């Protein structure tokens, strides 16, 4: 199978007086696993339905390999979509469900049998060919829905939160399977989800949406490590947001004064001048925590505080540290063998925290 290149050009869509898509533009590469991530109601499913042909638009265009498909009906587009409920035919077997689109194309029985058997092998469900959908688990139904969607050899596969109805463990297992399947078939996957972990774990690139607009597009690393604004910083993962004022401008850093924290250095990634007010983000896992004082010659940004709350998560412990000047800093400490000999940090312990100035950076220069 060969993936298609999808271009969405300045697409706007209204439902009555409500604008659900606001001049949306995206370029999705051939064979890419591309995720559209955002909260409920942000327009991501509507955008998927526009690509599939189930929704019209007020303005803009949708192109596949450089040619507009906007005026093509859904059945004429080389695109298939998988919905949240999989939409399997309950009265047909697994084999018959996968064969259904091939029968509509009036292929010969030999061609249908060959293609369906190839797809059953691809999803590793040869032994379930004669089962009814009611006899399948949620994960098996999802695989059958994917196989049926691939039967017509689409250029693009659209997936509308296909794992949302599954439990967390199965969801993670099937996400890995989906990623492996994408690698094997080579077509373009466009995956819609509100789950940040899903999007950043399997995608080549991610588009972050909010209120009908594209906020940021980039690799999972880029959107997590370099969020472009407050929404991007807070929607993907957790963070500490700190208001601060620039008190000194250095070559690489700003020295800032933050209420409830004090003075610290942050990375100079946006232009600001002395006296400007900033909003700064710092991921909790970037912060080191210890009951011992850090050597000042080795680190910047050292603060003292008391553990207000601790939450043991298995792979890490989440600490909420009340600093001497009042700010409560979220600090996530990963568990590893090499730190087992360190004193265990508990509730009400006095602690020191520190972070590299490169890990705290500006998400917004606030207006006066």
Curated annotation (Swiss-Prot):
Cited InterPro entries: AAA+_ATPase, ABC_SmlMolc_Importer, ABC_transporter-like_ATP-bd, ABC_transporter-like_CS, Mo/tungstate-bd_C_term_dom, P-loop_NTPase, PotA-like, PotA_ATP-bd
Compartments, as annotated in UniProt: Cell inner membrane
Membrane topology classification: Peripheral membrane protein
Catalytic activity: ATP + H2O + polyamine-[polyamine-binding protein]Side 1 = ADP + phosphate + polyamineSide 2 + [polyamine-binding protein]Side 1
Main location per the UniProt record: membrane
NADP as UniProt keyword: no
GO molecular function: ABC-type putrescine transporter activity; ATP binding; ATP hydrolysis activity
UniProt keyword annotations, A-Z: ATP-binding, Cell inner membrane, Cell membrane, Membrane, Nucleotide-binding, Translocase, Transport
Assembly and binders: The complex is composed of two ATP-binding proteins (PotA), two transmembrane proteins (PotB and PotC) and a solute-binding protein (PotD).
Role, per record: Part of the ABC transporter complex PotABCD involved in spermidine/putrescine import. Responsible for energy coupling to the transport system.
PANTHER family, alphabetized: SPERMIDINE/PUTRESCINE IMPORT ATP-BINDING PROTEIN POTA, SPERMIDINE_PUTRESCINE IMPORT ATP-BINDING PROTEIN POTA
Protein name according to UniProt: Spermidine/putrescine import ATP-binding protein PotA
Species the sequence originates in: Thermotoga maritima (strain ATCC 43589 / DSM 3109 / JCM 10099 / NBRC 100826 / MSB8)
Source lineage: Bacteria, Thermotogati, Thermotogota, Thermotogae, Thermotogales
């Amino acid at each position: 199978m060969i993936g298609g290149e999808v271009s969405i050009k300045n697409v706007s869509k209204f439902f009555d007086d409500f604008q659900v898509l606001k001049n949306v533009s995206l370029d999705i590469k051939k064979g890419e696993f591309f995720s559209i991530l955002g909260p409920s109601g942000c327009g991501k499913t509507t955008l998927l339905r526009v690509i599939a042909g189930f929704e019209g638009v007020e303005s803009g265009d949708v192109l596949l390999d450089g040619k507009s498909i906007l005026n093509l009906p859904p059945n004429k587009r080389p695109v298939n979509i998988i919905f949240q409920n999989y939409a399997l035919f309950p009265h047909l077997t697994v084999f018959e469900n996968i064969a259904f689109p091939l029968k509509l194309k009036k292929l010969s029985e030999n061609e249908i049998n060959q293609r369906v058997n190839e797809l059953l092998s691809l999803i590793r469900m040869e032994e379930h060919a004669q089962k009814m959908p009611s006899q399948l688990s949620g994960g098996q139904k999802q695989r059958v829905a994917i196989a049926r969607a691939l039967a017509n050899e689409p250029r693009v596969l659209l997936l509308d939160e296909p794992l949302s109805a599954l439990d967390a463990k199965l969801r993670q297992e099937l996400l890995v399977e989906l990623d492996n399947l994408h690698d094997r078939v080579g077509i373009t996957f466009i995956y819609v989800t509100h789950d940040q972990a899903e999007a950043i774990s399997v995608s080549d690139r991610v588009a972050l949406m909010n209120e009908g607009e594209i906020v940021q597009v980039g690799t999972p690393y880029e959107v997590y490590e370099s969020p472009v604004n407050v929404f991007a910083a807070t929607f993907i993962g957790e963070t500490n947001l700190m208001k601060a004022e620039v008190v000194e401008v250095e070559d690489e850093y700003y020295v800032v004064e933050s209420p409830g924290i004090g003075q610290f250095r942050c990375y100079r990634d946006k232009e600001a001048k002395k006296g400007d007010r900033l909003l700064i983000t710092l991921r909790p896992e970037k912060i080191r925590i210890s009951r011992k004082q850090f050597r000042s010659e080795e680190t910047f940004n050292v603060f003292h505080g008391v553990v207000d709350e601790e939450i043991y998560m298995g792979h890490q412990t989440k600490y909420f540290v009340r600093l001497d000047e009042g700010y409560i800093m979220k600090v996530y400490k990963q568990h590893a063998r090499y730190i087992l000999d360190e004193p265990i940090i508990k509730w009400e312990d006095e602690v020191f925290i520190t972070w590299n100035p490169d890990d705290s950076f500006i998400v917004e220069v606030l207006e006066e």
